[in-house]
């Protein structure tokens, strides 16, 4: 099956090396980092789990059963990939202060471990996630030297901050449904479904804008009318572009692209027609976005991994790095290798569909 992101431009050209990603769950390890400390008291039981080959929503549902509460009483800061070993916090609303016996739950699911239990005065929400720490192993690498050369470039320049294929659902189904909803003016009270489709719509258009900037040679430099980001503030780029580029190289500002909304683009000059063309190319997605009154936002077009390092052992390369919340490790890997398809065999004892892949953001 063709990757939904395959038409998008590569910063350094399509990789020549091939390798397997997530050949084993332990080849993709994720450690969640919250943006604050837990209080140790409050109405919410905080459970830090390590899961192998399971997705977040499945574990949350089973944890809710173990605690004797409805699924809506369990929340998280971010979804984690199924095909991985991941650590994250789940919060369970248990206002009476009780701590359930998890022994039966753990015996039923040896793929799930409980690492820590404490309490907090607020439930977990998606905005609570500061970022993730990754340990990613590329196996059966066809050309180790080529990957190492690219790693040097990635460490210096970063990679396109694409939303990963996980954002668009299995086989791109979320994106297909987003287009259908926009085309047919579908109205639904299913907030979760609507959120998934809106997210897919905005993410797709953002990716197209970033790809176009690479094609036009303005990924790593400002153009007239850009919007710069700096510490959650936005600035109109005008005046001497060379000075803006100096600030970009110094890491003081970032080039941004549109997360489309129902209001007008804030860009001008050269940047406005570049972005507007990609919005106009997706009338069904824009109909969905406008119909739901989404407000325009911005996202940096470049992704730079923090604390990036790597080790080589024969035909395996192990990467260690951290990413801020909302960024995709698979977007970094995409610049390094062409993935060799991996056939996975999972226990079919309970529903695979409900346990399929999720994003690392």
From Swiss-Prot:
InterPro entries: PsdUridine_synth_cat_dom_sf, PsdUridine_synth_TruD, PsdUridine_synth_TruD_CS, PsdUridine_synth_TruD_insert, TruD_catalytic, TruD_insert_sf, TruD_pseudoU_synthase. GO terms for biological process: pseudouridine synthesis; tRNA pseudouridine synthesis. Its EC number is 5.4.99.27. It catalyses: uridine(13) in tRNA = pseudouridine(13) in tRNA. One of its GO terms (molecular function) is RNA binding. The keyword ATP-binding does not apply. NCBIfam families: PRK00984.1-4. Belongs to the pseudouridine synthase TruD family. HAMAP family: TruD. Responsible for synthesis of pseudouridine from uracil-13 in transfer RNAs. This is tRNA pseudouridine synthase D. It comes from Vibrio cholerae serotype O1 (strain ATCC 39315 / El Tor Inaba N16961). The lineage of its organism: Bacteria, Pseudomonadati, Pseudomonadota, Gammaproteobacteria, Vibrionales.
